[in-house]
Regions:
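Active-site acidic/histidine clusters and adjacent loop/turn architecture
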Residues: 1-33
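Solvent-exposed, well-ordered amphipathic alpha-helical segments
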Residues: 3-4, 29, 48, 72-75
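Generic alpha-helical secondary structure signal
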Residues: 13, 17, 42, 83-86
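Extended, low-complexity, intrinsically disordered C-terminal regulatory tails
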Residues: 23-52
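Cytochrome P450 catalytic domain signature, combining two hallmark sequence patches
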Residues: 51-60
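Catalytic cores and adjacent binding grooves of peptidoglycan-active enzymes
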Residues: 59-144
Length: 144
């Protein structure tokens, strides 16, 4: 069974309890790494200036304390393997729905690769979107 390393545990501990419960459940079956939980002002502005965020501090979901957003990468990490991210996101979102249905978490979860939600009952994985839409494949956030 995979386990989180020290850095992943530290990052996840900065997140809302729903994200902690969700990803502590996910790691039992899928190896992954938590790269970012809470972002302070300096880290958020770096993310914005590098194009990794559309939000200035304190507007990002990573900026709340505890954070209502988390960036998690499936192993092995391959930034060019979109299929792996889609598969991982499907797993995470399915686990989130199950945990919410049984009352272990209270919030819905949105994935950063699908800001537009379901269209005709299908997740839109196309990359033919407006350039204003950030495809943030490792990003998961709570819908409160």
């Amino acid at each position: 069974m995979p386990k989180f390393g020290t850095r992943s545990k530290e990052q996840l501990a900065t997140c809302h309890i729903d994200l902690q419960v969700l990803f502590n459940t996910v790691i039992e079956e899928i190896d992954c790494s938590v790269v970012c939980g809470h972002r302070n002002e300096e880290d958020q502005e770096k993310a914005f200036n590098s194009g990794n965020s559309k939000a200035h501090y304190p507007e990002g979901k990573h900026n709340s304390n505890p954070s209502t957003a988390v960036d998690v990468y499936p192993y092995p990490i391959d930034f060019n393997d979109n299929e792996r991210y889609f598969w991982f996101a499907g797993w995470v979102l399915a686990k989130a729905k199950i945990l919410r249905n049984v009352g272990e978490i209270t919030n819905k979860v949105r994935w950063g690769g699908n800001w537009d939600g379901l269209k005709n009952g299908v997740i839109d994985f196309s990359y033919n979107r407006s350039p204003k839409v950030l495809n943030d494949l490792p990003h998961f956030e709570l819908i409160q």
